[in-house]
Amino acid sequence: MEFLERSNVFGDPKSANVFLQPVDAQDLSRMEEETESLKALCGHEDWCILAVPVANWNRDLTPWSAPPVFGKEGFGEGAAASLDRILKVIIPSLEAAYPARRYFLAGYSLAGLFALWAGYQSATFAGVAAVSPSVWYPGWSDWAAGHVIRTPRVYLSLGDREEKTRNPLMSQVGACIRRQETMLQQHGTDVTLEWNPGNHFVDPAMRTAKGIAWLLR
């Protein structure tokens, strides 16, 4: 497991409950806060979080191209390659060390969108925590309406002020996540939608911990 740096593993590495969480440098700096919050919420440490570094956030977590929302950097279509690495490299390496585990995906913002999209692509995951996910992403809601998710459990959350933005695309996030919840309910998915206080940038570590804790119930 040469890709598996000790600094990127949190919790019990031998646990049967493994959460794969795509992260950038800022997310990684908050992992200790996230895991301490998770310990407090769960009351146990029967879980392992593997923080999976993402080289290019806008490219590697999105399923198709889209124009920029802020600045000049648009979005790529690298989600398929990122998922392929998780399924064909990371999980087999973990299984070789400690087999018969349950694998989950968790992510914040665009990583939350990636986790949700991956749940439609593969039945490998026992659950997905899409925390403040970028479901405003162009074409996402219509795409999701035409597909059936393959993971049995989904945690959704959003800040109660996230839709109160001047950006016309991002202001749709509230309507989009409500629609997402309804679609999953109609497909018989075990889904919950939790509203957190604040905008997109409030308490990401605690919000992510709450999603993981729900999946551990």
Regions found by a protein language model. Give the residues of each.
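A short loop-to-beta-strand scaffold at the N-terminal edge of the catalytic core in hydrolase folds
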Residues: 1-12
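Serine-hydrolase catalytic machinery in alpha/beta-hydrolase-like enzymes
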Residues: 10-97
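The conserved beta1-alpha1 loop
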Residues: 20-24, 132, 158
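Alpha/beta-hydrolase-fold catalytic nucleophile elbow
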Residues: 53, 108, 131-132, 157, ...
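Gly/Ala-rich beta-loop-alpha elbow adjacent to hydrolase catalytic centers
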Residues: 106-111, 115
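Active-site signature of alpha/beta-hydrolase-fold catalytic machinery across serine-
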Residues: 117-121
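A conserved short beta-strand
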Residues: 124-138
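The feature captures the conserved acid-bearing segment of alpha/beta-hydrolase catalytic domains
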Residues: 135-215
